[in-house]
Structure formats: structure tokens, C-alpha cells
Amino acid sequence: MAAVRGAPLLSCLLALLALCPGGRPQTVLTDDEIEEFLEGFLSELEPEPREDDVEAPPPPEPTPRVRKAQAGGKPGKRPGTAAEVPPEKTKDKGKKGKKDKGPKVPKESLEGSPRPPKKGKEKPPKATKKPKEKPPKATKKPKEKPPKATKKPKEKPPKATKKPPSGKRPPILAPSETLEWPLPPPPSPGPEELPQEGGAPLSNNWQNPGEETHVEAREHQPEPEEETEQPTLDYNDQIEREDYEDFEYIRRQKQPRPPPSRRRRPERVWPEPPEEKAPAPAPEERIEPPVKPLLPPLPPDYGDGYVIPNYDDMDYYFGPPPPQKPDAERQTDEEKEELKKPKKEDSSPKEETDKWAVEKGKDHKEPRKGEELEEEWTPTEKVKCPPIGMESHRIEDNQIRASSMLRHGLGAQRGRLNMQTGATEDDYYDGAWCAEDDARTQWIEVDTRRTTRFTGVITQGRDSSIHDDFVTTFFVGFSNDSQTWVMYTNGYEEMTFHGNVDKDTPVLSELPEPVVARFIRIYPLTWNGSLCMRLEVLGCSVAPVYSYYAQNEVVATDDLDFRHHSYKDMRQLMKVVNEECPTITRTYSLGKSSRGLKIYAMEISDNPGEHELGEPEFRYTAGIHGNEVLGRELLLLLMQYLCREYRDGNPRVRSLVQDTRIHLVPSLNPDGYEVAAQMGSEFGNWALGLWTEEGFDIFEDFPDLNSVLWGAEERKWVPYRVPNNNLPIPERYLSPDATVSTEVRAIIAWMEKNPFVLGANLNGGERLVSYPYDMARTPTQEQLLAAAMAAARGEDEDEVSEAQETPDHAIFRWLAISFASAHLTLTEPYRGGCQAQDYTGGMGIVNGAKWNPRTGTINDFSYLHTNCLELSFYLGCDKFPHESELPREWENNKEALLTFMEQVHRGIKGVVTDEQGIPIANATISVSGINHGVKTASGGDYWRILNPGEYRVTAHAEGYTPSAKTCNVDYDIGATQCNFILARSNWKRIREIMAMNGNRPIPHIDPSRPMTPQQRRLQQRRLQHRLRLRAQMRLRRLNATTTLGPHTVPPTLPPAPATTLSTTIEPWGLIPPTTAGWEESETETYTEVVTEFGTEVEPEFGTKVEPEFETQLEPEFETQLEPEFEEEEEEEKEEEIATGQAFPFTTVETYTVNFGDF
């Protein structure tokens, strides 16, 4: 009876235990059932399921009843069933979990609570969810345990079958399993998982992605929170959690949130037997999961612990496909590859493969990954960095240091690549850095002032015609503070770099691996001669753009073609510009070079191909030396700029193009450029490509017209016999066998064809503006004496410098300053000269003869042979700058180039015509005070560049009467209109008559001389009266000298008259400066009159004059001169030859002044 009475009590206790969440009555209620289940389950499972048995729940036979029990009271039966189920679940999962995975589990899982799927013992709802997965299995074994609550635990084993890691766990092994659970919890945020109760629902969702399972899981989450058992983790999941940090694990949770597709991926992959082996350790962890619950969510690549349904409840802004983008921002490249590769292997999502295909390639196969790696490694080839700016002087002098220097002229600042020696060697400007002694501790250091990736060094020997010094081997060191230095090694020892074998050829020494540092040092090891070297450093700046030293750096804003152009590229670019702007551009050729390459020119004007009346013509030329390529590239950039800005409506460019005819010639020496381009920007020496193919220097191969002009000026032939402008070319220079380059002949023909007004040639190697004269003129004795006296007084030698100046010196200086002041670097005085001292004094301009005197230059020839004022622009120290320097150089020169072109509209302009309006060509326009004129063009128009001011301008032409007027020039851009109308004269007829008479000279008739007989008689009387007065004066002087005593020294008399001659103003105070008789002094003043009469009378007596002139000359000489007058005339002629002294009075009016002064 006691046993009978105790039965209901035991059943009640069991029910209470089942209701308690923390209770573990499973052993009491399910011992028999577990043993029966194990007998059948172990017989079916292979050795592998033994591991799963730890986690797998009991067989799924009681699933139908469990559903009813759950419907009646889920909370009460769940704990009890959970305790009974785990042993049976493990058996059923091992057998049928693989066969019946997805379809049945979701239905039963919906009925049960979401937690028990992985923890069969504690969570009956898991069994309820999983028995659906294995209803056939449960049907086999439900007969064994239909009456008992064991049916509910049988419902759990089917879930465990689909989720083998989470379902199988016998009660006996549970304590041992708890030791394994603590491993995964630390990396996972357990506290967040507990409230979510991800155990059952996550496992069910993982096994069956059906929507019903998710819905029920969410509904039952609050109830099973107390009984929650965390799902078993796959061994791979545990490793992943240990490898990655918490923030990375969180990102994984965010990624799977939106995509349900990824949930299905692990479900299909992980039910395989290998996955069942992994969960074996996980069941041990089930005991502790309530204390340290592990988040079921795992990376979408792994299926055991991947709890996506719980993350659906959480909000993440990163979608499943886009998770790669946030990873790209947070993760490194290695982390991205590690996370992406497993995703592709396990899940192989189409979205990810598509992204990789778009970025790296189209193949979705595994070899594609190898290809991606190859593409990533290809850019790791040797980085080619540009020069840091040693040659171009971007590296300032204070950034270069050395251990010592031989003397001041051989300091570290002279150690730049292609540095040239001064005018004389052994001065303060020599051609290299030389150390003080031959010790091997010498070094030269460069500070880049920013973090730089160094890739190589270019070395060169000393520039000298006497010494042969260069470094053959050297070491390289790097530092970030100039205190601690690290030598470049090859892995075993300090790496030795091989230098030069001669003093001129640059040699590149590349670093096998780039080095990032701020300072670089060169330690010479061996050398030839003295320890001297020049160098350039190759490096890329890695400092941020906002660095201190980069704040003021120039950055190009124009979208132009910044690269070096070969001959074909140049021709193609000019063609493209012409196609873009066909209405304002025209391409033509000046001629051909000695190798047959055409010298192309680009014309930019609103009416290309024609000279418009009143429109000045301007020219820019470059490439006159083949290795000076900066000007070549600047003109190509200028073509593009003018074309694009004109199309875009830039008012400044439109005004310039519409009012000016611009000619741009980028390469006057195409043969030389091809030679220089073969060596590149840094490896051609100073002279490679400078000359033409025939060996001519185009800049100095023009006719020497300076000597012709200066010789005529010394003979006083200018401007009557020799003009001061438009001098003709000597015939010897034009002969076919003359040694003149082909390019120069083409340039001269081009100059004569177009009426250029202003021009400039762009050169390199220096940083200044040079203006004529380029040829030095030997100063006269007076100028040398004045210069010596000025030097003694400490004044400037202006007298000597004036000998090198042109008549338009002030205008040339204005033009030079207009370019230099608009240039960004020419007027910076701290930069100094490139090769020697700064001849410009910080102004950026210099007279060519004072700086570098040369003969036969293009500037002097253009000034003396044409109307064009031409200057030379030396744009930089580096003749052949690197391609990376072009944007900066364009910004430095752009404004200056435009400003100089606008100067062509300064001064005066106009048209010279006759009274009928017919234009007069070759008329001369002269300006008072400027001994240099200009000629009118074929249309009668002219342009004269003048500084602001007021000028007296005269226009004269052969056969026309000269005309003069006053013209004002303002400071504003815009020439003053100053037209001339010339009237015809009879000089043309006179010259024809003279030609008929043998071109004899025509006597000049002074208009002030008397023409009538009465006037001539009156003049004779006046002359006779003056002669009498002079005779009386001479007698008085003679009497005064004779009355002196013997003690008086006669030589003292001559100096006294000399003083009176210079100081007295009254006419009668003059005394002849010499001791000659009074006749000599008198005839000196009177000689001019009598000689003029004689020159005019001699043709009357000796030759027969034409009838036309007889009527003019006969009345003049009707009256015969008196005999005394004729005798005096002959005496005066003889005395004039003897004395050689003559006063400047040459007219009759002068005679009256002489007599009055006398």
C-alpha cells in the first residue's frame, strides 16, 4: 500500500521537478528510456556518432505526444523532457539526422520552445521542434516509449539530428562537457545571447530555414529564458572566435543579419558527419552556457553555431552583401582576404563572386584567386621616382650639407647634377663639391624636409677642363633626424654602389628596395683624382599634402597634356589642337632641318593665314637648343590653353587672339631634341643635343650686323650712308657656299616674310631674362677714362655699360621686367644664380653683353635686321626637367607668357599713306631721342613699342616730304593711333636728272644767303668793315706786346688769352689760343664762309652747269669778288689745312656771331 500510495507522490514530485527550470530530474524519469534508446541507437550509429552521443538527444519516437504535452503546458514539461531526451536524441541524430534534415524540423520546432534544440536535456521545446525533423525515426521508436514523457525527449532528438552538435548530450557526459564549454564563451558576448535565448530557435533556424520555426522561436523565447541552454559550437567556430577580436566578431554578426540566404548555406553544409565530430566537445560546454551563454551567431561561413534568426531581431545598418564595404574601412588587407576567402569556399555566394569578378577578373573559379594575387604583386615592381630637385634648385642651398669642402668655390652647394664651372676655374663658382682631404670619412648629405621614398642616386664627376675628378664607388646611408644613420645593406654587409668612369656622364645607382626616410647621405669609398662629385637623388614624397613645406607649392589646375612629346607626338598634338579650334589655328612649316624634319609652327589668330591691317604679329620660339626642352613643352601647353580658353569664352584670351596674330614654334632644332630625348631627362650631359646635326649652334649662327653698324657710326655714316635699322645682310653670308645652318636660313626667311613686332626665345640652364645687345662693344678711350674715374669715386661704371646698350634700352628693360615680374620664381633674390653669381641683382633681368657676350645672336639680328624686339627667356636651371615637373613649371610661367604677349599692344601704331590714300611701304618711322627707326609693312601699317610718355614722331619715305607729329603713350595696354599722310616731292625728278648727269653732287644753297645783287653788295661792305676792325685790333695787340719790358717772360702771354677765351663773354675779349699770327685766328672763323663760297664757285669756273641750274647760280655770282677778298680766301684755305682748327660756324649767320664774339 505504501508503494501504491507513494506512486502518486512520486509522480507529483516528478511533475514539479519538470516545472522547475534549474531542476535536473532527468536521471530519475528517463533512466529506462535512455538505456533502451542507447541500445538501439548505438547499434545503428558508426564509431563517429559516439562523439555526437554526448550532444545528441534521445530517439524521436515520442514526438506526436510531446506536441500535445507542449500544447497543454509547455513550461512544465520542457525541463523534464529536456533531462530525459538528450541520450535518445544523440542516438536518433546519429542515425537519421542526415537523412531527414530540413523539412520536418521546422514544423516541430515551431511547436517547441526555441532553446532546447541544442540542449536536449534541459529544453523539451527543442525536442518538440526536432521530432518533426525525424518523424519517421520517432515512429520507429515511439512504440518503445509512447506512454511516458519520454516521447517528449524523443521529439528533441530529431532536432539534434539536424543539428548534431547541439542535440546529443547524455546526462552522464554532461559534467565532463562543461569543461569544454568555457572555451567558446569568453570571445562571445554571452550576456547578449542569454536574453535572446538563441539556443533552441537559433539551432532550429540553422537546421531549417522555414519561416514557421522563426516565428515560434520568437514566441517561446521569453519562456525558455530560464532554461536556456546554449547551442553546441563547432570546433571550427571556436577557433574562429579565438582568432578574431570582439569588434571583428561583432562585424560578423552585422553582416549575416539581413540575408536569410546565408542561414541556409550553413544548414546544407554542416549536417555532414564531419560536423557531427566537431560538436562532441561542444556538448560538454552545455552545462556552463547558462552561466556564460555563448552567442549562437557565428560567421556566416560556419553552420554549427551560426544563429542568424536571433540577429534578425537586432538592427544592423550593414546589409549582407555590403558587409565588405565596412570591412574595407575597418580591416586591413590581410583581414579582408582571410574573411573573404572562407566565405567563397564554404558558401560561394554569387554576390561576392560577382564583386570579385568585377574588380579582379571574370573567372569565378579558384584559380581566379591566384590571378588576383598576381595582379596585386605586379605593381610592386621597382617604383620609379622623379628627381627631388637638386639640379632644378628646388632643393635649396641650406638643405645640402657636407663633411668638409676643399675651398669656398667647391662647397656642398656646388654638388648639384650638371653644375657648371664659372668663367674661370679655381674661383668661387667651381663645378662640383670637393672634400677637404682624402679621408674616407667624408660625406655629402641632402635634407628633403619631408618623408621621402628614396629609389636611387645619380652621380657625376667634376666639371673642369683641367681636372679629372670623379667618385667610382660609394656607400649610402639614411636617417630621419640626421643623427642616427642606417647604412643600406644587401643583407650581409653594407652595399657598395658603383659610380662614374668619367667626369661628365651621369650614372644611375638604383636601390634594390626603396627606403623611406628624410635624410640621405653619400659616403664616397673610392675615387679618381680628388674627391669631387655632383649628384641628383631620386625619390617620391610620402608626406601628406597638408605638410608645412607643401603649403606654398604650386599645383596645376589646368587639364593639359603634361608630358614630354617626341617629334611625332608634337606633330599629333598640334594636329589635335588645330582640329579642336579650326577657326583660330593654322599649322604650317618654316622649312626643314638638316635631317629633313619639318620645323612646325602654330598660328593663332581670328583670321589665320592672313595679315590684317593694323594687327601686330607676335612670336614665341623654343627648342633652339635641342636639350632645352622646357620651352618646347610650355609652348605646346600654351597652344592647348589658348584653344580651350578661347572656346570657353575667357575674355582675356579672346581679346588677345582677336587683336594679335600669334606664332608659336615649339622646336627650332628638332634634330637636337631627338638626340637629347634618347638619354632622357637626367642622363644627358650639359651639351648633348645642343647643336644641330651639322654641328651649328643656331642661337649664335646669325649674321653679325653689330660690327657693321658700329663701324658706320664711328665713320659718321649713320644714318645717311648706313641706316640705323633694317640693315641688309652681307652678300657673303647669303652665298650658297656659306657656312650657314639649314635651320638658320629657314628662320631668316620666316622673319623677313612676317612683320613681327615682338618676340622671345625660350631657353634653359639659367633663370633670368636677357635683352640686347648680346655682343660686347669695345668702349672708346673716353669711355674707358670716364669709367676709371667713376670707379675711383666709387660710382657705377655707367659709361662702359652704355656701350652695350641699344637705343631702345629703356624699352627692352620694360619688356624684360614685364615677364620677370609676372613669373613666380625669377624675381626671388634668395635663389641666386644657377651656375654662378646672380648677374641680375635679384631683378631677374640682365643685359646679354654684360652677362654672356656672344656674336651673331638671334636677338641682335632680329633687332638690327627687322622691326622685331626679341628677348631671351631662361626658364630654369634644369634644361631637361622631369615629366613630373611640368605642371609646376606651367604654373610658374603661364601668367608671364600671357603678360609678355600683351606688351605688343604698348606704344604707337598707325598707317602711312600718301595724299590719295595709297599705303606707303618701307617708310621709316623715327622717334626723337631714339636713334633706331622701324619700317612700315607692305600695307603701310607700322607698330612702335614705346614706354609711357610723349614723343615726337616723324615719318619719311623716299619721294615724299617728311611729316612729324607728337604722340602720347599711356600706361594702359593699348597702342596710340598715330597715322601719317605724306606729300610727294620733286626729289624724285631731281635724282633722275642727276642720274642723267652722272650722279654729280648738287651744290647746297643756303636759304639765308643773299640772292639779289644789292644784298650781296651790302654783305661785302659789312665784311670789309669787319676786316678793318679786326686789323685795328691786331695792331693794338702788337703794340701791347712790344711795350713790355725785357724782364717780362713772353711765354706767359699765351695762357692769359686762353683763360679769357673760356671765361669772357664779351666779343672783344677773345684771344687766339696759340702764338700764331692774327691772320690765322681770323681766318679760322672766316674760313667757313669763304670756303663755302669757294666750293660753290669752283663748279662755276671749272665746269659747265646745266641750263636749269644756270638760272639759279648765275645771279648768285654776277658780282665779282674784290681782289683782296679773293686773296684772303686763298690764304684762309692754306691756313685751314695747316692749323686744322675749325669752329663749328658754317653759315653766313654764323659770321655775324663770330665777329661779334671776336
From Swiss-Prot:
Q: Which species does this protein come from?
A: Homo sapiens (Human)
Leader sequence residues = 1-25
Which part of the chain is the Peptidase M14 domain? 563-904
What is the official name of this protein in its record?
Adipocyte enhancer-binding protein 1
Bias regions of kind Basic and acidic residues — which residues? 100-110, 211-223, 267-289, 326-371
| Glycan attachment positions | 528, 922
Q: How does it assemble?
A: Isoform 1: Interacts with different types of collagen, including collagens I, III, and V. Isoform 2: Interacts with GNG5, NFKBIA, MAPK1, MAPK3 and PTEN. Interaction with MAPK1 may stimulate DNA-binding. May interact with calmodulin. Binds to DNA in vitro.
Post-translational modification here is noted as: Phosphorylated by MAPK1 in vitro.
- What is the tissue localization of expression for this protein? Expressed in osteoblast and visceral fat.
Listed CDD domains:
FA58C (cd00057), Peptidase_M14NE-CP-C_like (cd11308)
Which stretches make up the F5/8 type C domain?
383-540
Ranges of Acidic residues composition bias in the record = 45-55, 1108-1137
